[in-house]
Swiss-Prot record:
Gene Ontology CC terms: Golgi membrane
Gene name of the record: CSLD1
Membrane topology term: Multi-pass membrane protein
Species whose genome carries this gene: Arabidopsis thaliana
Family: Belongs to the glycosyltransferase 2 family. Plant cellulose synthase-like D subfamily.
Biological process terms in GO annotation: cell wall organization; cellulose biosynthetic process; pollen germination
Name of the molecule in the record: Cellulose synthase-like protein D1
């Protein structure tokens, strides 16, 4: 219970005053503690220089009654007014002073009433506290008395003085000097492209209609694709968070929270993995350690790992990680370590002692480094240890079975021998319930029981301080608690569709709801660790800010380590993460990209946003009342309630809530839904905060886990639980696409939710990306395949509801359409070669109109790109790498995805592109060795063909010009220019085929020879050898 300040009985005369109390509006605390009024006759704009200063505060002072039981400034004699003014420290004549008091101290007549009310929270009355104690007052100033400045509990009264209400986040608009020209150039280029296409259509090339037709179709599609891509970029914004304000609101002593215990909501962190052979357990363990050591209230944090393969190797690696976390987590807190992934921390090249103040840091770091090296040895030795254990137990079982068989068969073994199942064993001598090394029925990747193990229990509510340990670290005064951690592997059985990663995530959503029920869920891949220990708090600033209850998720940018310095294949993808995503943040929000995303649990459950307001307009910023679909229970309400639009969506008004057909038959799970919704609300500490919760509502301890709770959590991850429910259809991660992340985010936006893009000063998360060309192309192939699936499904943005904003709809439409650009891109890459082969061109002649349009389009595109680079903060080299890989991926992976999608939709045929050969790196110590490995795949065929065809075309074009009677060198250069444009974009691809030191695989020579012969035969057919007198290239 919060202790209250001493109370005294108010004068009955003062309580009977009919007029509202007068108050000082605005003040500034001086160095001596005195607060000076800054009120003036005119209203002060608090949004200027004063609003952000810590020494300016809003406060309300109740003015005591005058001796005749009338408030100051009421009607009375002049002498009384003057006397009262003089006693307050003022001067001047009576009537003048009385009028000034009315102007300066009256709150009810001020237009800044909201400024005063916004700092009043709860039922705590600072006015009564001030004037029922020994506080002093005066005209234009107020201060606390020096004596008795604390009350029972030892908290200073000044700590509870009304402070200015501070938002937790703010929008940082792109400067108009950058954004306005950017928008203007987009409009100008749009007009130029329109007139260029009109000119191209009305001026066909009669000499080569087939070239003209192919080119004009491609150019129209490119214009359409460019519009889809550029329109969502019209309103980019930046955002900033205020972690100090978050700390003051949720973790500082207050009247509702006198102990300063954290009032932040709970967060559940999900880590997903499936195969320890492809995703090394050491990498997953380091990710887990970075989560357990994150800077967030320990009792509010829970971590879960979803092992969809049910591997004992992952299970025991996580157990080892939890044991190491007992030292690693307090070490990070003691010395404020960043990053808190031990492998990344010990790999940092800079001085580790920088900014470290504790004298025992070097000793502690040396000790924990030695412990981590031993931890790595144990993790790396787990596969062999588990196999040896299995062999020992299996041998024991075999001897046991033979002994039993001899006893039953008269002392001899049966003729058929004794069969003993080669099982995988746990350390306690029991069978591993998951996947065995030698798969058997009930023990394979697609057929095993559900597993749930609480490896780290629910921490105590109060901090547990460590002490000095001989031979270990000194954790005196350091909280040594570790957040709760659970290993989860859902049940899998033949005949059930497990829906890959999306199904595993939904299983964790249900299990975590029963075990911890964090109001927010952070989703990470096993190779993405927390690089910024305050990342969760950064995201919480948006969720807990005014209007945060309408945010469904916070998407963080993906940052990668281990990328080659030149970023040959655009692995950093900064154009997308710093450009496109930042622009979408100015609309309805960024798309969900699969990792580094913090969800509102309530939004994952398929509910609409809490306030039924729809936004219209180009940028989705204009509010308009939404169209409500009222149920019978809502229609039966009183007319008064019908006329008044509710700001929230009451859970008990949803007729489907809790029904098995929607969420399943677990009542324990459905009971957690309203709790998660309530805990995810922002604080109601401002008059403009709607659907908020009172301060101090989340201070109660979490109950310990008991056997029935764990049993229920196991039940909700069973393979049959989702049967006849809406999981995967409207609830949780959505099924039916290999890019379930994009579809899941789309469904939330389609219901009216908003998302936010959070770019932190220090990267929030970091992960790994494939630097090998083949692996990179297969990654892009998976993304593009998912986009094609979206285009041919009900998740196409063309079928979205009106809650999806216009430009957001355009962005999602582009997500489904962009792979189809590959068809036209491939054709356009062959056009320069076809022009050189045929001696024709896409236009009748290179006249002034064509060259002028080409120049204007090129200049405007360059200027738009430069301004985009400016507001997004990406580098020119990054932009160029992205352009290069756009062409490489567009002519390979995107084209393959379109072929796959069309065959699947039209004929029901599924084609997969897999690796056919692998090579190993020559230098295992080279971290970029994988960059030089050449793994042949069918995705190489089209880009390789484009390169060879254009090279041969240049040779043929040059030969025709050299041996012609009248060489046309200028025309040849014009034809070669477009081929070189293609080849320049293909340079990283060609360099990747060379491998290390230019070693080209034999298969590349084979394909080059085949393509060259084919092209030569084609040229001979088109242009017979005896025609050597023609001009070489383009006819003018």
């Amino acid at each position: 219970m919060a202790s209250s300040p001493p109370k005294k009985t108010l004068n009955s005369q003062s309580s009977s005053l009919s007029r509202p109390p007068q108050a000082v509006k605005f003040g500034r605390r001086t160095s001596s503690g005195r607060i000076v009024s800054l009120s003036r006759d005119d209203d002060m704009d608090v949004s200027g220089d004063y609003s952000g200063q810590n020494d300016y505060i809003n406060y309300t002072v109740l003015m005591p009654p005058t001796p005749d039981n009338q408030p100051a400034g009421s009607s009375g004699s002049t002498s009384e007014s003057k006397g009262d003014a003089n006693r307050g420290g003022g001067g001047g004549d009576g009537p003048k002073m009385g009028n000034k008091l009315e102007r300066r101290l009256s709150v009810m007549k001020s237009n800044n009433k909201s400024m005063l009310l916004r700092s009043q929270t709860g039922d705590f009355d600072h006015n009564r506290w001030l004037f029922e104690s020994k506080g002093k007052y005066g005209i234009g100033n107020a201060f606390w008395s020096e004596e008795d400045d604390t009350y029972d509990g030892g908290v200073s009264k000044s700590d509870f003085l009304d402070k200015p209400w501070k938002p937790l986040t703010r929008k940082v608009q792109i400067p108009a000097k950058i954004l306005s020209p950017y928008r203007l150039l987009i409009v100008i280029r749009l007009v130029i492209v329109f007139f260029f296409l009109w000119w191209r259509i009305t001026n066909p090339n009669e000499d080569a209609m087939w070239l003209w037709g192919l080119s004009i179709v491609c150019e129209i599609w490119f214009a359409f694709s460019w519009i889809l891509d550029i329109l969502p970029k019209l309103n980019p914004i930046n955002r900033a968070t205020d972690l100090a304000a978050l700390h003051d609101k949720f973790e500082q002593p207050s009247p509702s929270n006198p102990t300063g215990r954290s009032d932040l909501p709970g967060v559940d962190v999900f880590v997903s993995t499936a195969d320890p052979e492809k995703e090394p357990p050491l990498v997953t363990a380091n990710t887990l350690l970075s989560i357990l050591a994150v800077d967030y209230p320990i009792e509010k944090l829970s971590a879960y790992i979803s092992d969809d393969g049910g591997a004992i190797l992952t299970f025991e690696a996580m157990a080892e990680a939890v044991r190491f976390a007992e030292y690693w987590v307090p070490f990070c807190r003691k010395h404020d370590i960043e990053p808190r992934n031990p492998d990344s921390y010990f790999s940092i090249k800079k001085d580790p002692t920088k900014n470290k103040k504790r004298q025992d840091f070097v000793k502690d770091r040396r000790w924990i480094k030695r412990e981590y090296d031993e931890f790595k040895v144990r993790i790396n030795g787990l596969p062999e240890q588990i196999k040896k254990r299995a062999e020992q137990f299996n041998m024991r079982e075999e001897l046991k079975e033979k002994r039993i068989a001899r006893e039953k068969n008269g002392g001899v073994l049966p003729p058929d021998g004794v069969e003993v199942v080669k099982a995988t064993w746990m350390a306690d001598g029991t069978h591993w319930p998951g996947t065995w090394f030698e798969p058997k029925p009930d023990h394979s990747k697609g057929d095993h029981a559900g597993i749930l193990q609480i490896m780290s229990k629910v921490p105590d509510l109060e901090p547990v301080m460590g002490g000095p340990n001989e031979g270990a670290l000194d954790f005196t005064g350091i909280d040594i608690r570790v957040p709760m951690f659970a290993y989860v592997s859902r049940e899998k059985r033949p005949g059930f569709d497990h829906n890959k990663k999306a199904g595993a995530m939904n299983g964790m959503v249900r299990a975590s709801a029963i075990l911890s029920n964090g109001a927010f869920i952070l989703n990470l891949d096993c190779d993405h660790y927390i690089y910024n220990s305050k990342a969760i708090k950064e995201g919480m600033c948006f969720m807990m800010d005014r209007g945060g209850d309408r945010i469904c998720y916070i998407q963080f940018p993906q940052r990668f380590e281990g990328i080659d310095p030149s970023d040959r294949y655009a692995n950093h993808n900064t154009v997308f993460f710093d450009g496109n995503m930042r622009a979408l943040d100015g609309l309805q929000g960024p798309v969900y990209v699969g990792t580094g995303c913090m969800f509102r649990r309530y939004a994952l459950y398929g509910f609409n946003p809490p306030r039924a307001n729809e936004y219209s307009g180009v940028f989705g910023q204009e509010k308009a009342p939404a169209m409500h679909v009222r149920t019978q229970s809502q229609a039966s309400q009183t007319s008064q309630a019908s006329d008044l639009e509710s700001d929230t969506q009451p859970l008990n008004d949803d007729p489907d809530l809790g029904l098995p057909k929607k969420f399943g038959n677990s009542t324990m799970f459905t009971d957690t839904i309203p709790v998660a919704e309530y805990q995810g609300r922002p604080l109601a500490d401002h008059m403009s905060v709607k659907n908020g919760r009172p301060p101090g509502a989340l201070l109660l301890p979490r109950p310990p886990l008991d056997a029935p709770t764990v049993a229920e959590a196991i039940a909700v991850i069973s393979c049959w639980y989702e049967d006849n429910t809406e999981w995967g259809d409207r609830i949780g991660w959505i099924y039916g696409s290999v890019t379930e992340d994009v579809v899941t985010g789309y469904r939330m936006h389609n219901r009216g939710w908003r998302s936010v893009y959070c770019i932190t000063k220090r990267d929030a998360f970091r992960g790994t990306a494939p630097i090998n060309l083949t692996d990179r192309l297969h990654q892009v192939l998976r993304w593009a395949t998912g986009s094609v699936e979206i285009f041919f499904s009900k998740n196409n943005a063309m079928f979205a509801t009106r809650r999806l904003k216009f430009l957001q709809r355009v962005a999602y439409l582009n997500v489904g359409i962009y792979p189809f650009t590959s068809i036209f891109l491939v054709v356009y890459c062959f056009l320069p070669a076809l022009c050189l082969f045929s001696g024709k061109f896409i236009v009748q002649s290179l006249d002034i109109h064509f060259l002028s349009y080409l120049l204007c389009i090129t200049v405007t595109l360059t200027l738009i790109s430069l301004l985009e680079v400016k507001w997004s903060g990406i580098g020119l080299e990054e932009w160029w790498r992205n352009e290069q890989f756009w062409l490489i991926g567009g002519t390979s992976a995107h084209l393959a995805a379109v072929v796959q999608g069309l065959l699947k939709v039209i004929a029901g045929i599924e084609i997969s592109f897999t690796l056919t050969s692998k090579a190993s790196g020559e230098d295992e110590d080279d971290i970029f060795a994988d960059l030089y490995i050449v793994k042949w795949t069918g995705l190489f065929i089209m880009p390789l063909t484009i390169i060879i065809v254009n090279l041969v075309a240049i040779v043929i074009g040059a030969s025709r010009t050299i041996y012609s009677v009248i060489p046309q060198w200028g025309k040849l250069m014009g034809g070669i220019f477009f081929s070189l444009w293609v080849l320049t974009h293909m340079y990283p691809f060609a360099k990747g085929l060379m491998g290390r030191r230019g070693k080209v695989p034999t298969i590349v020579y084979v394909w080059s020879g085949l393509v060259s012969i084919t092209v030569s035969l084609l040229w001979i057919t088109i242009s017979p050898p005896d025609d050597v007198s023609g001009s070489g290239g383009i006819s003018v």
